[in-house]
Design a protein with these regions (language model features):
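Short, Lys/Arg-rich, polar N-terminal cytosolic tail immediately upstream
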Residues: 11-25
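Polytopic transmembrane helical bundles with strong interfacial aromatic enrichment
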Residues: 22-169
Length: 169
């Protein structure tokens, strides 16, 4: 009877390990998809804003600002998914690389909040006021913060690939 109990306990422990590995695989996939989607959306915002400003066409600038405003809700779902899966994958890790990723993500979050406010302001300013010096200064701030966020996210993606062994240090 003791053998049967031990055997059942071993089977249960094996099943728990399998489920844990499966959960981790799902977390990794969701984290990867959220990373790719976030980088694509943010880089699209950055590039279209830059092209619109360099072109100087007020109609195109307004169009870009409207579309950015429409797509911000996508980031409202993607960025928390990225943070939650990243934190679950990191668990209580003390790895310097994981700690760097977590520090970078805090800055991405802070910059992201400022970028959302700037996007709303730039939409409002481009549609209900002239595209003037105030607009251009806010646009410059948005481009700088957007570039910083892209850089931080690319550095985090590289660190993630190194941690997974898919990229050599």
């Amino acid at each position: 009877m003791d053998k049967q109990v031990l055997l059942k306990q071993e089977l249960i422990e094996d099943e728990i390990q399998i489920v844990t590995r499966m959960k981790r695989k799902v977390l990794v996939k969701v984290h990867l998809m959220a990373t790719v989607l976030a980088v694509l959306v943010i880089s699209t915002f950055f590039i279209t804003s830059l092209v619109a400003e360099l072109g100087g066409d007020p109609f195109f600038i307004r169009s870009v600002k409207r579309r950015i405003l429409y797509f911000i809700p996508l980031l409202v779902f993607v960025m928390p998914a990225l943070a939650i899966t990243g934190n679950k994958l990191a668990r209580n890790s003390t790895s310097p690389q994981v700690l760097k990723k977590q520090r970078r993500m805090k800055w991405v979050g802070i910059n992201g909040l400022m970028l959302v406010m700037l996007a709303v302001f730039l939409y409002y300013r481009s549609h209900y006021h002239d595209i003037d010096l105030v607009f251009l200064l806010a646009q410059l701030a948005e481009l700088v913060l957007g570039f910083i966020n892209l850089l931080l996210m690319v550095l985090n993606a590289r660190s993630g690939l190194q941690l997974s062994g898919r990229l050599k240090s």
